[in-house]
Amino acid sequence: MIRAAIVGATGYTGAELVRLLARHREVELVGLTSRQYADQPYANVYPHLSGQVDLACQSQDIDHITDMADVVFLALPHGLSVPWVAECVRKGKKVVDLGADFRLRRAAVYEQWYHVTHEAPELLAEAVYGLPELKREQIQKARIIANPGCYPTASLLSIAPLCGQGLIREDRLIIDAKSGVSGAGRNANLAIIYGEVNENVKAYNVAKHRHNPEIEQEVAERAGLDPDAMAITFTPHLMPMTRGILTTVYADLKEGVQPTSEEVRNLYRQFYAGEPFIHVMDEGVWPQTKWSYGSNHAYIGLTVEARTGRVIITTAIDNLVKGASGQAIQNMNILFGLPETTGIEAAGIYP
């Protein structure tokens, strides 16, 4: 059995990790930490997991947690993961960081967007960006997994098959993204209380969202471009729903390139052939967030708009599962040589 600990287990991504790992046949949960709920039974914090988890929340004792676990999941705000990652590396333990501290490979870019100094820039080069459909071989050999952000997951799955194919302007993408409120975390925040969110849709962090450089970094790598030359427009919106992300990517075709929708769809199906969680839809079938609710599955719809010379790609995922905790477990499965779908194979909850 793989002994797993979750640091920051009482936020939404931490709770989703607990829910999924509690029924993972190859995992034993050995530690759940929480600053707010230390010493309280976990099921008191999340009663829906009564009978599933009999552990109490612990304080964040870095030596104790890293000693007893084979893999440590970090579900912490940015700026807090570095000491945990450094200790896991020192002790030869695997670590999957669901935060932002190791996603960006250049410390200067991280510091520009997150406004904190990176305390272990020497570890950035070792961290593997954990999007399994794109980085599976690197993940297999990794010690540090930087679990992607929720918006970048959906955005990159949308555009990856077209990158480097000579078909589109990868540096000029436009990404419109919509997310459920759980993406904002579990905290007392006026912007996400019921009266503010219900029957309301709003854009936020326009032209300054921290997932923008993450998307640009990975698109540039796949397309063989300079990340500093990227000019991707990314605009997120908050939706009056609990879970789900829907991204729509607009990609300009290069001059003289005129593929049909069917040709592009075949390219996507070849690219994702054999991927258990990726589903490329038929022409005219557009993904819905309800399809992926509670699951690790991603649904992709696309068309070529010949009139404007663009490819339009829409992708739906669950922000807490494929966009966070499910993908983290998918990465763990790869790290330990397990079937990739173990513990996360279930379809979404519908309706």
Curated annotation (Swiss-Prot):
SMART domains: Semialdhyde_dh. It is an enzyme of class 1 (oxidoreductase). The keyword NADP applies. Its EC number is 1.2.1.38. Keywords: Amino-acid biosynthesis, Arginine biosynthesis, Cytoplasm, NADP, Oxidoreductase. It is found in: Cytoplasm. The keyword NADP applies. It catalyses: N-acetyl-L-glutamate 5-semialdehyde + phosphate + NADP(+) = N-acetyl-L-glutamyl 5-phosphate + NADPH + H(+). It holds the Pfam family Semialdhyde_dh. GO terms for molecular function: N-acetyl-gamma-glutamyl-phosphate reductase activity; NAD binding; NADP+ binding. CDD domains: AGPR_1_C (cd23934), AGPR_1_N (cd17895). Pathway: Amino-acid biosynthesis; L-arginine biosynthesis; N(2)-acetyl-L-ornithine from L-glutamate: step 3/4. One of its GO terms (cellular component) is cytoplasm. GO terms for biological process: L-arginine biosynthetic process. The active site is at 150. Belongs to the NAGSA dehydrogenase family. Type 1 subfamily. Catalyzes the NADPH-dependent reduction of N-acetyl-5-glutamyl phosphate to yield N-acetyl-L-glutamate 5-semialdehyde. This is N-acetyl-gamma-glutamyl-phosphate reductase. It comes from Heliobacterium modesticaldum (strain ATCC 51547 / Ice1). The lineage of its organism: Bacteria, Bacillati, Bacillota, Clostridia, Eubacteriales.
